[in-house]
């Protein structure tokens, strides 16, 4: 009940951030990505495209053409989040001109992401990257997988490049860093908590989407993913201990990695109970988790974590469309379940 209440009040607070036109924004801009993220959050939390806030957000996305390639500084993030939002909206849309526009926009977003993939795998901010980073890359992969779930075809080499990239970029400790750096063909550098979770999710999604696809229930058994999950556990105490400020991006990354791989426990850690405890104690009486320029983004990340909503992976062997909305989480036990060390 506490989690349900936090989600309900959090959604109401998110809706208050919507502009009269229907869009959302962060940093005073990035309105396409912010609107896509907010719409995805509302729909993944059980909302309908007929709910006024969601309807206005969807209408704004469909009626305001994306400035393809005209800005470049946020393109991968924004295009990917619009793709995810559309993949959740389209199944609810009746056959109509609006649905056709949504599918056309989703197809164009997928085409852009394919063309923007770096030659060695991964994405950067722009359509013609000279390198990559793992933050943009996790959104690029999520956007492509969302498009696949809505019926868009993605060619095999796209996924093969990603599988190879994430396996070769994995560091000795099992984690990933912001960039993939190599010495004598061996990945070097320092892993981080958020990029390690991103690496697990990206490798899992890529494996589930490649010709030699793994069924969702087998993803956590993959040797590279298993090492990544162990690294996530090691990073948790340093990044999400009781005295640490909440890292909303990290929580969202952990949630996606664990949900895609079907991981309930990271070693001895119940990541959902621990993260939910932190979020429940950080939410203010108005349903807000954050203020300032990151408000929309962090509000959505908190809600998606609590709802355990994510872009699902489906393979030919389990091709029946799954409900993208995760079941309601179980009630939390009273108090903190365990002191973080």
Predicted regions and their residues:
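Active-site neighborhood of glycoside hydrolase catalytic domains
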Residues: 165
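N-terminal glycine-/serine-/threonine-rich phosphate-binding loop
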Residues: 18
